Amino acid sequence: MGKAKAPRQLKDNEAKAVARTLRVSPQKLNLVASMIRGKKVNAALADLTFSRKRIAGTVKKTLESAIANAENNHDLDVDALIVAEAYVGKSIVMKRFHVRDRGRASRIEKPFSHLTIVVREVAEKGKAA
């Protein structure tokens, strides 16, 4: 087993937001998370606004929460933020049964996911510090 891993500490120029127990499979959520990873937050918000994926609205809400955390809790400049990390974790899987013909039943699995978004303030290129 080994020791439990310590949670990652945020740096001074970072802020994060976590959405837990989202009713979507981790694979589908990771498609949307990888779409915004590494982008400036304004571009990421625009991409999520016009995405046709069902979960994109929830990801956008989580990203807006991370931006608000950066602005209000960490005093970071919103215009200089990028999506440093956007990762997905597995949560519970609800098991349900679907009645079939001839007296049989099939199992339906309804997966849930966790989403963590970390935004980081980067220095603008070309500006004198």
Swiss-Prot record:
GO CC term (a single one): cytosolic large ribosomal subunit
Residues spanning the signal sequence: none
Keywords: Ribonucleoprotein, Ribosomal protein, RNA-binding, rRNA-binding
GO function term, MF aspect, one: structural constituent of ribosome
InterPro entries per the UniProt record, alphabetical: Ribosomal_uL22 (IPR001063), Ribosomal_uL22_bac/chlpt-type (IPR005727), Ribosomal_uL22_bac/org-type (IPR047867), Ribosomal_uL22_sf (IPR036394)
Any one of the GO BP annotations: translation
Cell cycle listed as a keyword: no
Short name of one Pfam family: Ribosomal_L22
Family: Belongs to the universal ribosomal protein uL22 family.
Cited HAMAP family: Ribosomal_uL22_B
NCBIfam families recorded: rplV_bact
Function in brief: This protein binds specifically to 23S rRNA; its binding is stimulated by other ribosomal proteins, e.g. L4, L17, and L20. It is important during the early stages of 50S assembly. It makes multiple contacts with different domains of the 23S rRNA in the assembled 50S subunit and ribosome. The globular domain of the protein is located near the polypeptide exit tunnel on the outside of the subunit, while an extended beta-hairpin is found that lines the wall of the exit tunnel in the center of the 70S ribosome.
Subunit structure: Part of the 50S ribosomal subunit.
The protein's name: Large ribosomal subunit protein uL22
Classification lineage: Bacteria, Pseudomonadati, Pseudomonadota, Alphaproteobacteria, Hyphomicrobiales
Gene: rplV
